[in-house]
Amino acid sequence: MTRPIILDCDPGHDDAIAIILALSSDAFSPLAVTTSAGNQTPDKTLNNALRILTLLGRSDIPVAGGAVKPLARELIIADNVHGETGLDGPVLPDPSFAPQAMTAVELMALKIKQSQAPVTLVPTGPLTNIALLLATHPELHSNIEQIVLMGGAAGVGNWTPAAEFNIFVDPEAADMVFKAGIPITMCGLDVTHQAQVMDEDIARIRAIENPIAQCVADLLDFFILYHRDPKWGFTGAPLHDPCTIAWLLKPELFTAQQAWVGIETKGEHTQGMTVVDRYGLTGNQANATVLFDIDRAGFIDLLAQSLETYSR
């Protein structure tokens, strides 16, 4: 049986690649794509989701825009990483279809209610939409199988020394999600910083002769530029968001640990930090499966093999 999923994202180069990876597989039944502000402004992330689905010929998947700002803060965007459009690099088609008139939360709620099997939510941006869904529709919690999210880290930040971008943008939303009691898998920087795509990997992808692979190669050519800054110490570019889909497809590529995760919402230097209790020091019951390591070569193989399916 295919797993029903909803992708909640803020495209974003790595969000776009996560969508492409997910839709290459018959393991999933994609119910909806919803968007939030984050990597770019809400109008641009919504448009980018429509552009990617148009490229993939998947206008059958309903799309809805969500929260335009965090629950209690002003919006921060990552245009320094993703460019003016949010998907700088490739030439993408204009959307061939329109978003739904309803909001992201309304669309998610409708699809979860209608689903015969529990739904997996895959948020790869700030957690505002997911928090609003859980708060306004407690009756639907029982039909949510799990939340597999990209965000956080066990001890390193990429937006502040303590905080990863997605959680930092809306820590109050993240706090609500981690306290909701729904099974969570956290794909944080500990694992995503190992999921680097190198120049030779981009060449391998470009050698796959279909338009989707060419688009991904173009996305990566732009995305890697930001990560060449020596301060990061990267050889390539970390593909954060596709790790969520890779975990669902091939969990054997990862190492993971059950742990309690708390969200810091008030710290002077640590707002947005995910406090991961690896050693059980708090005595709190584990509320997440936290990913720590990845087989990078296996991850790149999965990505390349998935892109090859678009040639058929």
Curated annotation (Swiss-Prot):
Active site: H240
GO cellular component labels: cytosol
Coiled coil: none
Presence of the UniProt keyword Hydrolase in the record: yes
Protein EC: 3.2.-.-
Function: Hydrolyzes cytidine or uridine to ribose and cytosine or uracil, respectively.
Record key words, sorted: Glycosidase, Hydrolase
Single GO MF descriptor: uridine nucleosidase activity
Top-level taxon of origin: Bacteria
Keyword Cytoplasm annotated: no
SUPFAM superfamilies: Nucleoside hydrolase (SSF53590)
Family as reported in the entry's similarity comment: Belongs to the IUNH family. RihA subfamily.
Upper classification of the organism: Bacteria, Pseudomonadati, Pseudomonadota, Gammaproteobacteria, Alteromonadales
PANTHER family linked to this entry: INOSINE-URIDINE PREFERRING NUCLEOSIDE HYDROLASE, URIDINE NUCLEOSIDASE
Gene Ontology biological-process entries: nucleobase-containing small molecule interconversion; purine nucleoside catabolic process; pyrimidine nucleobase metabolic process
Name the UniProt record assigns to this protein: Pyrimidine-specific ribonucleoside hydrolase RihA
Gene: rihA
